[in-house]
Design a protein with these regions (language model features):
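Iron-sulfur (Fe-S) cluster-binding segments and ferredoxin-like electron-carrier domains
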Residues: 20-28, 259-262, 298-332
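Short, basic/aromatic recognition patches
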Residues: 226-235
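C-terminal accessory region of radical SAM enzymes
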Residues: 192-226, 251-309
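Short Fe-S-cluster ligation motifs
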Residues: 42-54, 320-334
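Flexible glycine/acidic-rich beta-alpha junction loops that bind and position SAM and/or redox cofactors
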Residues: 150, 169-189, 213-226, 259-261
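Short, small/polar residue-rich loop motifs at catalytic or cofactor-binding pockets
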Residues: 237-241
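Radical SAM/AdoMet-radical enzyme domain recognition
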Residues: 3, 18, 29-56, 60-176, ...
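N-terminal pre-core extensions flanking Radical SAM catalytic domains
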Residues: 1-28, 40-44, 247, 270, ...
Length: 334
């Protein structure tokens, strides 16, 4: 099971698509003491992987202390970072604290395009420098890419790039228009474009030696099955089943792109929230509406619950409209 803690709202970039609308520090952020107590509750709940994200998690002064505490509880600490703040010293301290892998964002092989998307000139160069620092420290890293219409044709090239520089994984995030992302909703791929890209990604995954995983596009499990391409992933959308997020202020939600509150760690221990929250209990019924509820791939895909909520007035159990198979739009097997 995986939990992601958005450790801070503070960030040194101004990314167009940021789901958290990160920029400045939020005065309500969990303190070091609160964070450590929550980490112990996460371990008690049976979670294995803890993602430190943000904002930019490396902007927290106590980040090394928190990572070390997570590792001491038997958790596997990993990161979601823009990579620009990773120096040799930072990489060494992360490794010593027990960090297992750094998820670093690269949205284009064209530095100018990446920088424009990330809102800061020079971000691409700083990110690549951060990757090199990880390599020198012996710290595993993976590449994260957000898909929009202008980089769609680069995605498989970025996978090749990720493999060439020694990444262990390429995680490909399909844009969900929340946070600042709602202002660039028009850059999201259309339904059939989603389907075509998923086919390209799964074919590429079969060619390369590194792990490749689409995120926020749970239909990839169906696509892989239809193409006869084996994948180690047995479930598409994990929200509330084996995954959740905790906001910088302690609010627990099923995923980073959903606004439904499942609880507050300042009011109730995390392990109790995970076990008893009505939001999580409803998600675990898998009683989906519309096409998702009738789909023969429901058990492995589950539809994107965040998209269901966004496009169906908050009903996170509704159908995922971004599925070509469900809408019988010329997709194989539909």
């Amino acid at each position: 099971m995986i939990v992601s803690w958005m450790t801070t709202n503070k960030c040194n970039l101004k990314c167009e698509h940021c789901y958290q609308d990160a920029a400045d520090c939020d005065s309500r952020e969990l303190t070091t003491v609160e964070g450590k107590a929550m980490i112990e509750q996460i371990a008690r709940a049976g979670f294995k992987i803890m993602i430190f994200s943000g904002g930019e998690p490396l902007m927290r002064d106590d980040i090394f202390e928190l990572v070390a505490h997570a590792a001491a509880q038997g958790l596997r600490p990993v990161f979601g970072s823009n990579g620009t703040l990773i120096t040799d010293e930072v990489a060494r301290k992360l490794k010593e604290a027990g960090a297992c892998s750094m998820g670093i964002s690269v949205d284009s092989l064209d530095a100018a395009k990446h920088d424009a998307f990330r809102g800061v000139e020079g971000a691409h160069a700083d990110t690549l420098a951060g990757i090199e620092a990880c390599k020198r420290a012996g710290l595993d890293f993976q590449i994260h890419t957000t898909v929009v219409n202008w980089n769609r044709n680069e995605i498989c090239d970025i996978t090749d790039f990720a493999q060439s520089i020694g990444a262990v994984n390429h995680s490909i995030f399909f844009l969900i228009p929340v946070g600042r992302g709602k202002y660039i909703e028009e850059t999201s791929l259309k339904v059939l474009e989603n389907e075509a890209l998923l086919q390209d990604i799964m074919r590429k995954a079969a060619e390369v030696d590194i792990d490749v995983k689409p995120t926020c596009a749970p239909q990839f499990t169906r696509v892989a099955d239809q193409l006869g391409i084996p994948t180690r992933y047995t479930r598409g959308c994990l929200a509330g089943l084996t995954y959740c997020v905790i906001g910088s202020e302690g609010i627990v939600r099923p995923c980073a792109y959903m606004t439904e509150d499942a609880g507050d760690v300042r009011e109730q221990p995390f392990d109790e929230i995970w076990a008893t929250s009505p939001v999580f209990e409803r998600l675990r019924t898998q009683a989906y509406g519309g096409n998702c509820g009738e789909c023969d791939h429901k058990e492995h895909c589950g539809g994107c619950r965040a998209r269901a909520a966004y496009y169906h007035d908050g009903d996170y159990m509704a159908q995922d409209d971004y599925c070509a198979y469900g809408q019988k739009l010329g997709c194989k097997g539909a």
